[in-house]
Amino acid sequence: MIIIPDIGTARELSEKLVSKNKESDGRPRTKYSGAELLEMVKEYDCLIGPAHAFTPWTGMYKSFDSIYDCYGKAPDFVELGLSADTFMADTVAELKDFPFLTNSDAHSPWPHRLGREFNQIELEDMSYSSIKKAIKNKDIKANYGLVPNLGKYHMTACTKCYKLVDPLIAKENKMKCSCGGTIKKGVDFRISEIADYDEPKHPDFRPKYVHLMPLAELISTVYDKGVTTKTVQGKWQNLIDNFGTEIDILINASIEEIAKTDPSISPAIEAFRNKTIHITPGGGGKYGEISFDKKLEKREAETLTTLDNF
């Protein structure tokens, strides 16, 4: 992830980084190593750090056991990704001096995919130099991020049938599922491999981490309708019109006021705040799912025992 001062610099840097398959898989690709890339972007006064650092497809910790093995020296920050949070990342000792960012990427224009994660940063003014100074000085006041279990690579799972599997059993079976699909290591297990502590050790500068989930998905679960249907999108828009933002609805607005607008949604918001919503962990490329019963706890218990349960 590169934070760039302005559009002109972005164009210059893009031309320098251009490669034959730059649009492969919807992501820019480059021939440069992490260390070379770091040195290059510094010439343009940019900030750089690994995006979704722990994810199994393209994350930095997929290929390296240390951030210094990738970049040669310390980058400016670590972006955690949807499938991890501060509590997971702060079990890795080498990350204690890095500011954490939560900046979700977007693969569609739907509101529930935009701005799923963001940072609260104290700025002197609305400028790149102020943003740079805040990140360098670790003046991040809060990270807002998806509940990690909802991330589509949180748990080790098959990329074809999406069943969860014990990572050690997956290794024994050469990461092959009985359905013929490939098992992809989850962020949860990858962090356990490189972790130095059983419990997180937060440095003094580490800000609070506020867990979120997309409001449209809560509405979808309550009304048992697809998240992009007119029903769900209409209910979502009505709440936004009345309260302003998803954060105000999920975190700040009173349950009583929400109930006046949509009495069916207010219990779901209350359950979210009380952490009583049940989550099917995501894995293998499939997002986690939310429910208001325990129907998915059995699935996890069964699939984490043996490969024969797939």
What do the predicted segments below correspond to?
Residues 4-7, 16-17, 36-44, 109-310:
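C-terminal functional module detector
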Residues 11-12, 58-59, 88-89, 110-112:
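Short helix/loop capping segments that flank catalytic or ligand/cofactor-binding pockets
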Residues 97-113:
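Short acidic/histidine-rich active-site segments
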Residues 45, 96-97:
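Residue-level detector of structured alpha->beta connecting loops
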